[in-house]
Regions:
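Cytosolic juxtamembrane amphipathic/interface segments immediately preceding
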Residues: 2-17, 158-166
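N-terminal signal-anchor transmembrane alpha helix
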Residues: 9-45
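Alpha-helical transmembrane segments of multipass membrane proteins
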Residues: 25-33, 135-136, 180, 184, ...
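Interfacial helix-start motif at the membrane-water boundary
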Residues: 57-84
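Conserved mixed alpha/beta catalytic, RNA-binding, or beta-rich assembly cores of soluble enzyme
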Residues: 95-118
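Alpha-helical transmembrane segments of helical membrane proteins, especially in multi-pass transport
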Residues: 128-151
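Terminal transmembrane helical module of multi-pass membrane proteins
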Residues: 143-206
Length: 206
């Protein structure tokens, strides 16, 4: 029984390679973001501290200027880029680069809170970035792995191969990823401000 379950969830070799490449790109971007955040010191570090303190003060007062559509677009734009790149040969290089950038901005933003507030910064960093990442990270990888494999096939095509038609599986996967990304945007709009407000009160009062 265990062997059957294991075989069912085992990925083909090409998918495992694609997953490893994208994971490495995302991790490399994340490590770079953390290192860059840790290097902020002197006047730059002071300005960063003032900025994040002011940001938490706005969060505590519930006056952060955030609209629904910009948040939804912020969550969807990376996914749309991955889906689009997967339809061209450029995706073979473009998708890993995009994963690296996404990992960099994610970790840099979170690490800045820890750089300024120490351990206390973990709480607002998780509420602001980590909570939605539980949704958009799976969506990104779910679109990225088949996307990079599709881009590889596009690279091998010849001019006389004809037009590629998108399969029903592609549309189902795209809809699932879009649902996760949009849910992350709604979570960031309705839930995150409440949790961030509570975290800001704890940090600024201590």
């Amino acid at each position: 029984m265990r062997l059957e379950i294991r075989k069912k969830w085992d990925l083909p070799l090409e998918q495992r390679i694609a997953l490893a490449v994208l994971s490495a790109a995302f991790l490399l971007g994340g490590v770079t973001g953390c290192l860059l955040a840790s290097l902020s010191s002197g006047a730059g570090g002071s300005e960063l501290g003032d900025y994040l303190t002011g940001y938490l003060e706005l969060a505590r007062e519930g006056t952060l200027p955030k609209g629904l559509w910009p948040l939804l677009w912020g969550q969807a734009k990376y996914l749309l880029a991955v889906l689009a790149l997967g339809l061209t040969a450029l995706g073979l290089a473009g998708i890993p680069i995009l994963f690296g950038l996404r990992g960099f901005f994610f970790s840099f933003s979170a690490a800045c809170f820890c750089r300024v507030f120490g351990r206390r910064g973990l709480l607002p960093a998780f509420f602001l970035f980590g909570l939605t990442a539980l949704l958009w990270v799976p969506a990104l990888f779910l679109a990225g792995v088949p996307g990079i494999l599709s881009a590889r096939k596009m690279l091998r095509r010849t001019p006389g191969d004809g037009v590629i038609s998108l399969s029903g599986a592609w549309w189902c996967r795209a809809a699932m990823c879009a649902g996760l990304a949009l849910t992350a945007g709604l979570l960031e709009y309705w839930v995150v401000p409440v949790l961030l407000r509570a975290a800001a009160r704890v940090i600024l009062s201590s």
